[in-house]
Every structure is written in C-alpha cells, then in structure tokens.
C-alpha cells in the first residue's frame, strides 16, 4: 500500500510532496542526479510530487545544461519553474548599468548587499521571495503534506520554511554539501552566532528529518546540534542503475594501449597539476602504460565556459596522451565508460569531501586510482573494493606508482576479481540508499494542522 492522505480537490489521495531544488534537469550540476533520483523515487513509491526549480534559461545561459536529463523525470511529476536572475554572471553588456560599466567594484559591493538583504547567500538570496510565493501558490492549489528542500543553494530551504510556519507542513532538509561547515578544511564557513548560524539552528530545530551525503558530515552536525541528532540520517548519493556503466568482467585487448578516464566536474580544489606530473612520469616508467591515454570528460570549472587555466594545463600534456573531451549527457555515460580500462578519481582534499561519481565508478568493476587526500570521505566508500589503488600522498612518485599498479591490474585482473568489484558496488545503488527514508516518510501523523505550526522569528 502506498502513502495516502486526505483527497485533494481532484480526488487524489496520495501524499503530496513538494521537492525544492534550484538545480534540477536540465541543470548539469553534480547535485542534479541526486535531485532527479530522489524525485523519481518518491513518485515510484506512490507519492504525488511537485518540483520547484529554476527556469531552463538559468542553466542554458549560466551553468550549462544537459537537455537529455529532462526526459528522465517521471511523467507524473509536476515541475514548476521560477525565473532566476544572476546579475554577476550576465555577459550581455547591453544589460549592464552605467555603474557596473564605470565603477565595477562599487557595483559588485552594492550587488552583494542586495543579494544578502533577504537571505544570507550571495547570488541566491534574492530568489527567496519568488520561491516562497511559488511554494505558497502550490499549497493553495493542492495542499502539500511534506516539503523536501535540497541545498545548495541554501535558499531552497526557505520554501519549506514558509510552508511550515504558515501551514504546519513538515519538511526534510537534504544537504548535498554543508552550510556552516567548510568540507575542505573542516572550519566554519560563517561566523559562530552569526546570521547563517542562527538561521540554520532554527531550521534544523523544526525539521522532521535532515539528510547528509556521508557519515563524517552527519557526525559533525550531530555534535553541533545534539538535540537534532536523532533526526539526522545519511542518504549517500549512490549510483543510478538506469544510467550505471556496464561492469567490465574481461581484460582489455592486449594489443592496444590502455585508456584511463575521468568523468565529472574538475574544480580548482582538484589536484589536476599533480596528476598531470604523475601521469607523465608513470607513462614513461611503467611498461603497462606505454602509449596509454588519459581522457577527461565533463566540465572544467562550474560554469558553461571551461576554465582557461585548466584547459591550458590539459592541452600542455597532449604529448603525454592527455585529452579533454567536454561534457557528456547523462544518457550517454555508459558508452563513454566503455572506452576506459581504468578510472581516475580526482577530488579536493578534506575529511568531509565525497563525490557522487565514486559510486558510479565502483559499478564498472574497473581499477580505480584515488588521486586525493587519503582521509577524504570517498576513501570510506571504496575501502574494500578489490581493484582500488589509493595514493598515500600527492607527490609525483606516489601518483606514478598508483597509476602503474592500476595499469598492471587492468591488464591482469581475473574475472573473479572483477565480479567481486561489481558485487561490492551493489550496496551503493541509489534506490537502496533512499528506500529507508521513503518508508519512514510514508506515514505522516499530525502532518498538518488547520492553525499551522508554532511560528518563531527568523534569524
């Protein structure tokens, strides 16, 4: 029996979930796959789902889009799109004010103050008003039983907040990253006791559940908010079976050079320079890497235009067999993975850093070279994977040795070892990660009152 609720005006008795995510298809951001999978999982479990997200133009103009993802949203899901303005990324000079033209520093400071006036998030703060208005409009048309807001940006939480304050709608905070915690250095992103800190404490205190992508981030928040700890859960990203690469259970053709591959977004936190040095050394010293290729697929930086510095670095190593191939639609990922004999996992440093691609990588059954800080949370995921080759440091020699070991495994690992890799990955299917939470939310006693929830003051 699926989740049920009182009938709406059209007679539909299913629980109505409002899912809020700035980045939803056709966005190409890393978090879009979590949003897509979560929405589809709610719909498949019998919930009636409405999504609040930004207009398509937002992604087409500013961050890049993957149009193929829209076809993957289940047809019964209703998607409501809200215009989003991003002045700082506006490149059309005809839309620039005179102040921006002739006093850009003054314009940036004024824009920053405007951004955070209603919500403390540069670039995204102004979206609060249209987001809240849209959430209330959805609720007026068909009462919402549960709101699930996925951040970042954290302004997404405001839609759930306004429904809870005015109508008593319970909500889930789904942290794809963190708000106060700097996941790279473990410090604070915002001042203790400041506006963000107060706002987060208030929102956490009223949340029905709080989801985090890994145990280190959940533990950090549980220690900081012990009264909310029992409602905090890990919902790992996992891999999506419908997009997952096909496990490779046979070694590559011994007559051709090996191909190593990376798929994802390379940020400035990733040790790309260290990798290129290690790759060049490994290719000249390890026999299994003779004439080997390394392909980078995805985005160089977070925006639609590739980072010129990263692109120059990759192109400067063309003679070492390193090439950049650009973004790949999610629906074509399997074909790209089929090109590879081993995988490169490049991540930024930090105990709290994880990655969605690590689960997808594991599903391939291929050797995986972890080129990141050994204490990175991704190491917790891969520990026990039979063909995992982590570095102990990021020196040229350590990277070269790990690449050489992975190349030898790519050539000689037997079918049993590869099958064990694929079996290891099964635990990280995204539907298995989501199932316990959806089951827990299927029954929402006292979910909504006619008078609304107790209202506190915003920080």
Region locations from a protein language model:
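Carbohydrate-associated surface elements
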Residues: 216, 238
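Membrane-proximal helix-turn-helix segments that form the acceptor-binding/catalytic region
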Residues: 37, 118, 122, 133-136, ...
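Nucleotide-activated donor-binding/catalytic signature segment of Leloir-type glycosyltransferases, i.e.
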Residues: 295-300, 305-332
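Conserved donor-binding/catalytic core segment of Leloir-type glycosyltransferases
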Residues: 18, 252-270, 276-279
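N-terminal subdomain of nucleotide-sugar transferases
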Residues: 1-87, 209, 282, 286, ...
